[in-house]
C-alpha cells in the first residue's frame, strides 16, 4: 500500500472518528496497520478510537506509542494526560500535561495548561492551579473555561474579589458565555451580592432560555423570591 493510499485511508478513519463512528473507524484503521504502524498519526487515531469506545487502557497504548514515535506531538501528550488522569494515575497525567505545554509547536497549549490546572486544583494545589490558569489565558484569552479555573483557584485561596474580577474578564471575552454568566452569578451569591446575582440569573433566563444553564438560573430566581 502506497503512502498516498495510506493517507487517504487515514483521512477516512478520522472522518469516522469525527462522526463518532468508532467501530467503522477501527475497521478502516486495521486495514492500514501493516503499512502505517510506524506513523504517530496511526497510533494517535488508534488512541482516539479506543477512547470513543471507552477502552481506556488500549487508548492509552495508542497515545503512548504516538509520543514514542514523535516526542513533540503535543496533542497526543495532552490526550495521554487525560487518559492517565481517568485511570487514576495523577502523577503520570501531570507529567504528560507538563510535557504537552512545554512543546512550542503545540497549536493549542491552553488545553494542556487548563487540564493541568484542573488536576492541580483537584489535588488542593491552588496556587499552582492559578499559575496554569494564567498560562492558559496567556496563550489564548478567548479560552473561556480557563477563566472559571482561575476563579476557582482564587476561591480556594479565599481571594473572592480576585475571583469576581476574573469572571468579569471572562464575560468581557465572550458576552454570550452562559457558563460564565452563571458562574459569576453564583459567585455573587456566595459573596452576599444577591441583587446583582439576580440580575445575571434573569439575563440567562431571558436571553438564553434554551441553554443548559437556564434551568439552574430559574431555580436560583425561585429561591431568591
Where are the regions a protein language model picked out?
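Terminal, low-structured helical/coil segments at or just beyond the last alpha-helical repeat
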Residues: 3, 170, 174-225
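Residue-level recognition of tetratricopeptide repeat
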Residues: 5, 39, 73, 107-109, ...
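Structural marker of alpha-solenoid helical repeat scaffolds
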Residues: 35, 69, 103-105, 139, ...
Amino acid at each position: 500500500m502506497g503512502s498516498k493510499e495510506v493517507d487517504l485511508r487515514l483521512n477516512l478513519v478520522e472522518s469516522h472518528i469525527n462522526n463518532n463512528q468508532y467501530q467503522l473507524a477501527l475497521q478502516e484503521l486495521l486495514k492500514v496497520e501493516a503499512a502505517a504502524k510506524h506513523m504517530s498519526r496511526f497510533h494517535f487515531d488508534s488512541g482516539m478510537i479506543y477512547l470513543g469506545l471507552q477502552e481506556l487502557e488500549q487508548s492509552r497504548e495508542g497515545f503512548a506509542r504516538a509520543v514514542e514515535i514523535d516526542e513533540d506531538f503535543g496533542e497526543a501528550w495532552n490526550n495521554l494526560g487525560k487518559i492517565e488522569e481517568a485511570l487514576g494515575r495523577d502523577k503520570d497525567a501531570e507529567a504528560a500535561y507538563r510535557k504537552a505545554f512545554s512543546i512550542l509547536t503545540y497549536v493549542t497549549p491552553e488545553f494542556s495548561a487548563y487540564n493541568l490546572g484542573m488536576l492541580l486544583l483537584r489535588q488542593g494545589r491552588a496556587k499552582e492551579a492559578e499559575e496554569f490558569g494564567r498560562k492558559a489565558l496567556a496563550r489564548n484569552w478567548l479560552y473561556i473555561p480557563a477563566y472559571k479555573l482561575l476563579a476557582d483557584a482564587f476561591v480556594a485561596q479565599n481571594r473572592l474579589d480576585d475571583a469576581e474580577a476574573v469572571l468579569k474578564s471572562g464575560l468581557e471575552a465572550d458576552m454570550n458565555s452562559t457558563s460564565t454568566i452563571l458562574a459569576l452569578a453564583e459567585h455573587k451569591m456566595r459573596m452576599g451580592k444577591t441583587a446583582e446575582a439576580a440580575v445575571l440569573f434573569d439575563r440567562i433566563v431571558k436571553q438564553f432560555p434554551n441553554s443548559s444553564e437556564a434551568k439552574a438560573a430559574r431555580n436560583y430566581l425561585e429561591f431568591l423570591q
